[in-house]
Amino acid sequence: MKTMTMVYFKPKPEYFEQYVEALKKSSPESYILTRDDEVIEIWLQQSVEKLAEQQLEALDWLDDHRYMLEEYSPEEGHTRPYTAFVEQEPSYITEQN
């Protein structure tokens, strides 16, 4: 089943634009959104297995760029990740396929 992952980041103000550009460069298949002082990355995967395959690479990338981020809290760390199963996609997307 398809999954959708949304990860929230809070770049330090002095790194905001640099972080957005780095994320866009490393994630051409993702939606990259900005809202106030946060950056949100959203991507779809065809299965949980595909999601798991990319996790190590994503964590390595995050480790290399962690210095640019503010911590949300000691418990949450530098990201707020959410993953869910896609139960329905908008008709305009499914009609294109």
Regions found by a protein language model. Give the residues of each.
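Active-site-flanking beta-strand signature of metal-NTP-handling nucleotidyl enzymes
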Residues: 3-10, 40
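Short, solvent-exposed coil/turn elements at secondary-structure transition points
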Residues: 9, 36, 85-88
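Intrinsic disorder/low-complexity segments, especially N-terminal tails and targeting/processing regions
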Residues: 42-44, 95
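An amphipathic, aromatic/His-enriched active-site/gating alpha helix that lines ligand/cofactor pockets
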Residues: 24-35, 46-82
